């Protein structure tokens, strides 16, 4: 068994900063302290018994000491060495500190085997002011399951200065306190112990107080303040002292507190006036309440001892009625009116006293000065309260008299009025004055005058009296109503509801009453044959303009009005203002299709396209206009429906129908297109047109395809019944046979004409062709009123607008009376000598260039062996045949043929249509393929040969327009 003993010497050994233990550890026995030199037996026995007890108590216990506030990791002691173990054996034997669930102040270094601090240790926090501060910890040896108790003593360091509970202490001391009086001072506190604790106090040097420190039975020191000599508050009211507390550490630490000695006043001083006598002069007319002067007495005491109050001494009734003394401020004010004639001098005794009753006296001498104390008086004897604005200058407004009770210069009075008024003062006799108008008055500038008449004497200072005269200016009707602007503009959308408010017109009249009461009216006039009152009306009282009808922008776009504003004066005055009423366009008109036109029988026109056409080939062009204006009239074209999707495309802005790809043999002869034209209004309006395109490469192909032409597959026809299909097929077969016979006759006639031409005979001219419809319905050829550019480059071009020119419909009564079913021509020889019947030379301006000719995009030569017809006769015959055949094959009726006014063919191959019911838009059209206008075309119809009409007819790819 091992025993560890502490020395018996009461003076414990000092622990070093290295944390060396303050004991020796022995193995196998108990070390006992050496006895004294000559101990007696009793003392020796007591020591042995005590050591035996200590051996049992202190067995397996180690004591260390360490200073507080050391850094973390500071060495406290070497556990391994004290246990007789090597540092590596600590881990092998499982040596560790047993935790008790609280913060550990120490830790075991496993490498060195030393006990170190786990953090900063504050002794004052652990043990407060206890003289001994010891903390215990237990070390477990796991291999032997033994507990080793370790005690660590925390040694105090001087880390806290003395401090006072308050930084400043106020002590009140009476200024008459006797020397030797004691006053307790605040105590300081130092949490350190021993020599590091509070050791004493110091007081800064001063001539009135000293410091005496008393020690109590518990050893605590109590500082006291001792008065050394008499005090005087008036000399020094506050004394500032500094009390310092210090400890005995090294270095010495200290704390301070400010001591404020406030002297309490005693009434040891009487009030004293600043002057033994006060002199003052005052004018007799000084107003009541005027401060005359202020008497002042001072008292150096404080509080009630220094509060001075004032009063009159031996006051007489006369003085108490004329003067008043403020007891607190010492102000003497005028209580009653002073009169120099009554008394010119006053002698007043004034007394000052403090709270306890000490007094002082002084005199106030008042001299009264004579003054101009009477103001002039103004008496109005005659007055006019109103005057008309048309009154002439010099009109009398008032008559008054002035008077002043003073004498001498104080009684001389002069009168005046402001300079900016249209009035003047005229002195008559004595002290009488007249108030007159200086110029003509204008009520619209100033309707009421407040005239101030000032009467002033010549005293020092001068006194004056003001008299106010009120004058009303009566109105006359001298101003007509006026509008803020010389003219007005108003805007109203078309299709407005009846009774809609358009504009509110307001006129101003600076007059008053009936002269300013305004009525509004419109000047009588007519517009488009109707009075203006049928279009608009105006409220005579409010000036609000109303619409009596719904306006139409397409009928008129503006309306000029003249508005009159009249007052109710006598005579009445008036003024006029012009109003321009503009009608704003609304999108209320759908686009109108100009080409192709809609025949009266409901059929659609036929456009021709050769099968050899490449992609981008111009088939036709849709022309439309919109009656609206601006954005509402901007049109765009699009393809709504097509019997062969992807075959055709429509120009968005031009309306040109072009092939989107090259035509193939499998493409049907008849192609049906639905083109929609839409404007850009809000909401947009649109119109649709149905086009029928016949696809063929040559005349034989056309004739061959006509027999096998089938109606295009249309989802809308899926509902036709079987009997309708059979009927249409039967009619088509009969009609095809008729057309075949008719075509043979026409070919024979054509061959005959070619033989005559070959023999060199000069043709007298071919008259205008006359046609009668197949079923007795006339097919009238009508000259274009609107043409579209259909050149090869028209995809990039736009519409060109020409001057309007109507062409009459050409009708031949003779052709109607002939028995020939289709065509009767006059004898060519009979017309040879008639110059009026001679055919005009072909106009080269109407011809297509070689690149524009039909067929394979103008690649064919212009010889007589060409595929397409080379004269007007053949072309007209081909058109009639295609018209009849395509109509019967497609619809079972004359839907493909031309109704009244059209032959149903494209503009490229000479379509004609009537625009009798369409507005005149001819200024928007030019003749395709030509620089000529419609006027030139009209001249051509009259038989006049145009310039350049001697071109080669064989090279023309287009027949001459009729």
From Swiss-Prot:
The record's annotation in SUPFAM superfamilies points to: Cadherin-like (SSF49313)
**SMART domains of this UniProt entry?**
CA (SM00112)
Q: Name one GO molecular function term.
A: calcium ion binding
Q: Tell me the keywords, alphabetical order.
A: Calcium, Cell adhesion, Cell membrane, Glycoprotein, Membrane, Repeat, Signal, Transmembrane, Transmembrane helix
Which residue stretches does the UniProt record annotate as biased composition, category Basic residues? 952-962
Protein location: Cell membrane
Q: Using the UniProt annotation, give the residues that carry a glycan (glycosylation sites).
A: 450, 576
> Which Gene Ontology cellular component annotation is one that this UniProt entry carries?
plasma membrane
- Where are the compositionally biased (Polar residues) regions? 836-871
State any GO BP term from the record.
nervous system development
Record domain Cadherin: where = 60-164, 165-273, 274-378, 379-483, 484-598, 601-713
Transmembrane feature ranges: 724-744
Q: Which PROSITE patterns match?
A: CADHERIN_1 (PS00232), CADHERIN_2 (PS50268)
Protein's UniProt name: Protocadherin gamma-A4
Record lineage? Eukaryota, Metazoa, Chordata, Craniata, Vertebrata
């Amino acid at each position: 068994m091992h025993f560890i003993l502490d020395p018996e010497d009461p003076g414990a050994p000092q622990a070093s900063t290295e944390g060396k233990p303050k004991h020796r550890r022995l193995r196998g026995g108990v070390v006992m302290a050496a006895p004294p030199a000559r101990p007696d037996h009793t003392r020796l026995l007591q020591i042995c018994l005590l050591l035996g007890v200590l051996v049992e108590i202190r067995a397996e216990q180690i004591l260390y000491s360490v200073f507080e506030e050391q850094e973390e990791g500071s060495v406290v002691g070497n556990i391994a060495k004290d246990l007789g173990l090597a540092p590596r054996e600590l881990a092998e034997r499982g040596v560790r500190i047993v935790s008790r669930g609280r913060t550990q102040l120490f830790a075991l270094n496993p490498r060195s085997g030393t006990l170190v601090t786990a953090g900063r240790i504050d002794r004052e926090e652990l043990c407060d002011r206890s003289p001994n501060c010891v903390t215990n910890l237990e070390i477990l040896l796991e291999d032997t399951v033994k507990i080793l108790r370790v005690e660590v003593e925390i040694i105090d360091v001087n880390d806290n200065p003395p401090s006072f509970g308050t930084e400043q202490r106020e002590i009140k001391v009476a200024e008459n306190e006797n020397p030797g009086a004691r006053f307790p001072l605040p105590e300081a506190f130092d949490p350190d112990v021993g020599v590091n604790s509070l050791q004493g106090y110091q007081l800064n040097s001063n001539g009135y107080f000293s410091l005496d420190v008393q020690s109590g039975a518990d050893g605590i020191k109590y500082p006291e303040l001792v008065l050394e000599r008499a005090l005087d508050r008036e000399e020094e009211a506050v004394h500032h002292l500094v009390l310092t507390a210090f400890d005995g550490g090294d270095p010495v630490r200290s704390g301070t507190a400010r001591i404020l000695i406030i002297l309490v006043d005693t009434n040891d001083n009487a009030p004293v006036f600043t002057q033994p006598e006060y002199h003052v002069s005052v004018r007799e007319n000084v107003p009541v309440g005027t401060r005359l002067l202020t008497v002042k007495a001072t008292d150096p005491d404080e509080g009630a001892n220094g509060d001075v109050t004032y009063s009159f001494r031996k006051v007489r009734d006369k003085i108490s009625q004329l003067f008043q003394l403020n007891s607190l401020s010492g102000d003497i004010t005028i209580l009653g009116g002073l009169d120099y004639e009554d008394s010119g001098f006053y002698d007043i005794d004034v007394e000052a006293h403090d709270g306890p009753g000490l007094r002082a006296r002084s005199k106030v001498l008042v001299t009264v000065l004579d003054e101009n104390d009477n103001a002039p008086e103004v008496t109005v004897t005659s007055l006019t309260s109103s005057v008309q604005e048309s009154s002439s200058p010099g009109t009398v407004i008032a008559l008054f008299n002035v008077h002043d009770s003073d004498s001498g210069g104080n009684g001389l009075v002069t009168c005046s009025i402001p300079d900016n008024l249209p009035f003047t003062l005229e002195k008559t006799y004595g002290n009488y004055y007249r108030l007159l108008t200086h110029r003509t008055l204008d009520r619209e500038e100033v309707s009421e005058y407040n005239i101030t008449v000032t009467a002033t004497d010549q005293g020092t200072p001068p006194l004056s009296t003001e008299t106010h005269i009120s004058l009303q200016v009566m109105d006359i009707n001298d101003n007509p109503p006026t509008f803020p602007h010389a003219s007005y503009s108003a805007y109203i959308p078309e299709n407005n509801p009846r009774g809609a408010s358009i504009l509110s017109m307001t006129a101003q009249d600076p007059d008053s009453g009936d002269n300013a009461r305004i009525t509004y009216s419109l000047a009588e006039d007519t517009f488009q044959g109707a009075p203006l009152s049928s279009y608009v009306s105006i409220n005579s009282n409010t000036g609000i303009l109303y619409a009596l009808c719904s306006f139409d922008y397409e009928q008129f776009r503006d309306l000029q009005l003249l508005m009159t504003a009249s007052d109710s004066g006598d005579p009445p005055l008036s003024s006029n203002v012009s109003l321009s009423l503009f009608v704003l366009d609304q999108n209320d008109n759908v686009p109108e299709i100009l080409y192709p036109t809609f025949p009266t029988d409901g059929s659609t026109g036929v456009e021709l396209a050769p099968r050899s056409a490449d992609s981008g080939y111009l088939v036709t062009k849709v022309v439309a206009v919109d009656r609206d204006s601006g954005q509402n009239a901007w049109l765009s074209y699009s393809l709504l429906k097509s019997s062969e999707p992807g075959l055709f495309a429509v120009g968005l802005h031009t309306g040109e129908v072009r092939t989107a790809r090259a035509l193939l043999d499998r493409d049907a002869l008849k192609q049906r297109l639905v083109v929609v034209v839409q404007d850009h209004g809000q909401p947009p309006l649109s119109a649709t047109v149905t086009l029928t395109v016949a696809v063929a490469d040559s005349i034989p192909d056309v004739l061959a395809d006509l027999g096998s032409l089938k109606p295009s597959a249309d989802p809308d026809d899926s509902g036709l019944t079987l009997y309708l299909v059979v009927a249409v097929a039967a009619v088509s077969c009969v009609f095809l046979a008729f057309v075949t016979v008719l075509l043979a006759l026409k070919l024979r006639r054509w061959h005959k004409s070619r033989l005559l031409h070959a023999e060199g005979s000069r043709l007298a001219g071919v008259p205008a062709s006359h046609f009668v419809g197949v079923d007795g319905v006339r097919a009238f050829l009508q000259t274009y009123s609107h043409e579209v550019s259909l050149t090869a480059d028209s995809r990039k071009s736009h519409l060109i607008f020409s001057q309007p020119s109507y062409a009459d419909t050409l009708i031949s009564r003779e052709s109607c009376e002939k028995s020939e079913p289709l065509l009767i021509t006059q004898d060519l020889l009979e017309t040879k000598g008639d110059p009026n019947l001679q055919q005009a030379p072909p106009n080269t301006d109407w011809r297509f260039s070689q690149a524009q000719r039909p067929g394979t995009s103008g690649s064919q030569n212009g010889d007589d062996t060409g595929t397409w017809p080379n004269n007007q006769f053949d072309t007209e015959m081909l058109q009639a045949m295609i018209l009849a055949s395509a109509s019967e094959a497609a619809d079972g009726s004359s839907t493909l043929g031309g109704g009244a006014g059209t032959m149903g063919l494209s503009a490229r191959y000479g379509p004609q249509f009537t625009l009798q019911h369409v507005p005149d838009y001819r200024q928007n059209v030019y003749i395709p393929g030509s620089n000529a206008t419609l006027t030139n075309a009209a001249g051509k119809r009259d038989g006049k040969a145009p310039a350049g009409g001697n071109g080669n007819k064989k090279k023309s790819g287009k027949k001459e327009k009729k």
